[in-house]
């Protein structure tokens, strides 16, 4: 069974844009599947105020995913455990962001390209730590 129904509109995470007001607006135009902005796993674990704001659902009752970026296994594990206590439908692991501030930390696409085995271990860590209702919920 697919994660999203065929033909579904899915709003990808976009840093600086997919905040609560933006998600509310796209819902009015029929987008049923949305994500938070990309969230740094370390910032979530250390409870940064800006990060906690990004991770809020607000009054959004629709399908909502959270996207994490990171490369440190214990930090990713702890971030997934924190997400277990939040109300998200899916956890997305970012292995594609080319932004310099992400690549400098060997995260996103640089992590996937330079340490593919590490990226696999990171993904496995997230899957094993996640308690989302469906295992396909970690993508």
Language model features: what each stretch is:
Residues 3, 14-86:
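Glycine-rich, positively charged N-terminal anion/phosphate-binding segment
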Residues 4-9:
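Extreme N-terminal starter segment of soluble prokaryotic enzymes
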Residues 10, 35, 65-67, 92-94, ...:
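Conserved beta-strand positions in the central sheet of alpha/beta enzyme cores
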Residues 13, 70, 77-80, 84-89, ...:
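Conserved alpha/beta-domain cores
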Residues 54-65, 111-134:
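Alpha-helix-loop-beta-strand connector modules within alpha/beta enzyme cores
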Residues 138-139:
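Conserved small/polar residues in nucleotide/adenosyl-binding loops
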């Amino acid at each position: 069974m697919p994660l999203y129904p065929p033909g579904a509109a899915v709003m990808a995470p976009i840093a600086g844009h997919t905040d609560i007001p933006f998600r509310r607006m796209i819902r009015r135009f029929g987008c049923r599947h949305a994500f938070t902005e990309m969230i740094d796993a370390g910032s979530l674990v250390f409870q940064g105020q800006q990060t906690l704001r990004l991770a809020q659902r607000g009054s959004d009752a629709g399908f909502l995913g959270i996207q994490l970026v990171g490369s440190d296994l214990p930090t990713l594990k702890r971030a997934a455990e924190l997400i277990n206590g939040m109300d998200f439908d899916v956890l997305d692991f970012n292995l594609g962001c080319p932004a310099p501030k992400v690549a400098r930390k060997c995260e996103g696409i640089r992590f996937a390209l330079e340490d593919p085995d590490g990226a696999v271990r990171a993904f496995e860590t997230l899957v094993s730590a996640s308690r989302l209702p469906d295992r396909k919920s970690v993508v």
